[in-house]
Amino acid sequence: CALPIWTDYCYNLWLARFPGLNKDGAWHNGDSYFHVNIRTLVEVPYLYTRLTGYNYFSDPWYQGNALYVIYQQPPFSKSGGNGSSHQNVLTPSGTRVGYADALARMTGNTYAADYVRRITAKQPDILQQGSTSKAGGLAWFRLQCDKALPDGAGLKDLPMGHVFPQSGLASFSTSLDDTRKSAMLSFRSSPYGSTSHAIANQNAFNTFWNGQSLFYSSGHHTSFTDKHGVYCHRATRAHNSILVNGMGQRIGTEGYGWIPRHYVSDNISYVAGDASNAYGKVISPLWLLRGKQSNLEYSPENGWDDTGLKVFRRHIVTLGKSGYSFIYDELEAEEPVTWSYLLHTVTNPMNVDKTKEYVHIQATSKDGVSDAYLFSAGTLRTDTTSRFFVPAVNWLRADANGYFKPYPNHWHFTATSDKQKVYRFATIIYTHAKDNAENGQTVPRKLKDSSIQIGDWNIKANVSTAGKPSFEVRNTRKG
């Protein structure tokens, strides 16, 4: 009888690949392609649970994955901005909400249940959207599962942030309880590198207000390996990170980052990303073959070469629930190189203003603003453009009428240093409502002791090219 053989094969095939490649519950390939796996993540373990009587959803990965679903894309928010096609994930889809519903019922996770209730209260038909789709539709599961949606602690009871260190993701929101009043920051520095649908955005961050993107990864997923898709969406130049001598991070697992330290609380949170090993020539046999097949050149002219990079550590401190974040970059190379600090927007052009103390870059959306104040040693050469390195041409995706909708341009800011072996950037970002009357009081002030005061926070940071990298953040509010 072949039945035992097939049963053994199917079970072990699922076990080798699922539920995830890690224990923290996140999906390193990004939010868009996470949805491709939803039916497999639910229907297969549900079948095995019914056959054996053992609850396969008791794997701790599923509890972590519920937090990934919530923190990476809070209710009514755009995706955190990782992986191919992330820019198309504007709000939680019906398949995502349906998946959270299944998780809540099968694991008893009340945070996922609250996520579902909040979204369905405003979008009562959302569980019908995509319910029969090939990859994410869970209509068959819902016809069989009679477990109730659990009650208990909800989104207001969660910490303001969560870090997934094995996957290399972090996300912080000032109000998971109410996205309309929430400043969000997402971050990636991943051991998985930029292979498959993951992108070369080690040590990159994105900001949001009311679920709308502000500083955000740019480019379009025109296809998996065409020139725009690789040079302008997958490559580091598309993300809010750093270029070294104009060069970006390797494509492949070799271009990796990691999160060595993190701390989360509602008073102050911290995450450190290390992308020191991410840069250099593309050496992945798989991606070299794909490049050859697609007429791609991983050349210095296109942004890949040896850089002599020794250290790229990015420290991010979220200053409570104030909407302020502080970012400190420690950079070092074997020889003097230029260091380019990148920011991007996909909704509106950026406003840029240079003062003696800092460069002010402002991103806006319909309801929100991110003000970035960039400090460094010496004078930075700045440039802002609305042009991609390679134009985005929609040659692949037509609608039902055969119309190929044009891809819009995005906006790109670059601040480049002179050649230095050691360099530091310090950035204060304030993300807030566009109509915030207190915005005029948020401009950073340089004090006599060279520290920076902004709001109730005092920051000391070594941005010179001498001495050890260091920073200190203190809250100065009394009482």
Q: Residue spans of the language-model regions?
A:
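Carbohydrate-active enzyme catalytic cores, enriched for enzymes
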Residues: 36-214, 418-424, 441-479
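CBM-like, beta-strand-rich accessory domains located in the C-terminal region of large
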Residues: 130, 221-479
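Active-site-adjacent bridging/hinge elements
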Residues: 7-21, 179-185, 307, 394-407
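Long, repeat-rich segments with strong aromatic
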Residues: 15-16, 20-22, 27-43, 48, ...
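Short, small-residue-biased leader/transition segments that mark boundaries at the very start
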Residues: 1-3
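Secondary-structure capping and boundary motifs in well-ordered enzyme cores
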Residues: 6-13, 30-40, 58-66, 112, ...
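Aromatic/acidic polysaccharide-binding cleft in carbohydrate-active enzymes
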Residues: 82-93, 97, 214-235, 240
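Long, well-ordered core segments of solenoidal/helical folds
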Residues: 5-26, 61-78
